[in-house]
């Protein structure tokens, strides 16, 4: 009896010791995580830029219905961001399929505005997709695209966003593309001027990623509220099979040169990321070099995290990009 009792007592003691050690380990890890988060927050105060989150970083959980796009402000706040960059295609189907699209648009905007206020977030810009080709050589189609973008200018004004991001798809001949793009941008920027909204062109593939041509377009438009949104990674000029997306890139504009040439017209900046090495560095983009270009241009606004990788979860990729921006920014 005594021997059995001693064995039971010994087993109980070992179990208690194990639980105690695990508890201590978790407590230390939690404290370490909290300290790291606090240090990151403190370090952000000394940066030359603020951090925003591009909603596209969450496209996978949104498309798989794991995340309601209406909860974007809450998720961005949880991840430690201050600003929001919305992607309109996440709301377009709901709006377009409604019995009264105009009324549904207002419901969506009211919801987004309420959420941003609830979580103390700043609405920065709307990324517009699927509203027509602004660089089309067909004047009727081009003007219709301008008209279709105007509702999002109104939406940006209502939400308090400073800009909308547009694409310049359409013509494939450089001279035709420049003339068509400049025409559409002038018309849209003129409308947006009265709404206190900027029209920003992102390098988003093909001729819009040929930054020499894009700069010419900016000079042709020559309006204060028409500018650029440099993206660290979107410099593909041509893909296999002539595809717009997905296919392998076979020709690319020099990315650092491209960002440097876009910065004089920049009113927002997008920090694209894909994969990271063991030290947390982006594997194909030198973030310190990119941030130096941005800082040297005198930019002090928001930099938006836009993670597009597949090797880690969206949350992990977003935080890795955010941490890299903070780390690289502190070194400048």
Write out the residue ranges for each language-model feature.
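N-terminal pre-domain/capping segments
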Residues: 2, 21-158, 163, 176-179, ...
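Bacterial N-terminal signal peptides
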Residues: 11-20
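Acidic/histidine-rich catalytic cores of soluble enzymes
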Residues: 46-47, 182-292
């Amino acid at each position: 009896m005594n021997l059995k009792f001693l064995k039971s007592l010994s087993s109980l003691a070992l179990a208690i010791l194990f639980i105690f050690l695990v508890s201590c380990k978790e407590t230390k890890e939690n404290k370490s995580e909290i300290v790291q988060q606090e240090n990151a927050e403190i370090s952000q105060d000394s940066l030359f830029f603020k951090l925003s989150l591009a909603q596209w970083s969450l496209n996978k959980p949104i498309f798989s219905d794991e995340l309601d796009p209406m909860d974007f402000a809450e998720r961005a706040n949880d991840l430690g961001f201050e600003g929001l960059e919305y992607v309109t295609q996440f709301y377009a189907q709901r709006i377009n399929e409604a019995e009264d699209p105009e009324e549904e648009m207002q419901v969506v905007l009211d919801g987004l505005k309420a959420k941003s206020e609830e979580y103390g977030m700043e609405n920065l810009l709307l990324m517009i997709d699927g509203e027509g080709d602004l660089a089309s050589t067909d004047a009727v189609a081009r003007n219709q695209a301008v008209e279709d973008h105007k509702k999002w200018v109104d939406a940006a004004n209502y939400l308090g966003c400073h800009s909308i991001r547009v694409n310049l798809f359409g013509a494939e001949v450089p001279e035709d593309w420049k003339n068509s793009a400049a025409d559409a941008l002038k018309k849209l920027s003129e409308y947006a001027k009265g709404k206190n909204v900027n029209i920003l062109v992102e390098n988003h593939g093909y001729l819009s990623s040929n930054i020499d041509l894009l700069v010419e377009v900016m000079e042709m438009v020559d309006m204060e509220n028409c500018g650029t949104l440099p993206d660290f990674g979107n410099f593909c000029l041509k893909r296999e099979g002539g595809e717009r997306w997905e296919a392998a890139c076979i020709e690319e504009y020099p990315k650092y040169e491209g960002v440097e040439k876009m910065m004089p017209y920049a009113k927002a900046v997008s920090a694209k990321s894909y994969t990271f090495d063991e030290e947390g560095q982006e594997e194909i983009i030198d973030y310190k070099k990119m941030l130096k270009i941005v800082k040297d241009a005198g930019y002090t606004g928001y930099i938006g995290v836009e993670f597009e990788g597949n090797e880690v979860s969206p949350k992990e990729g977003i935080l890795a990009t955010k941490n890299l921006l903070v780390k690289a920014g502190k070194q400048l």
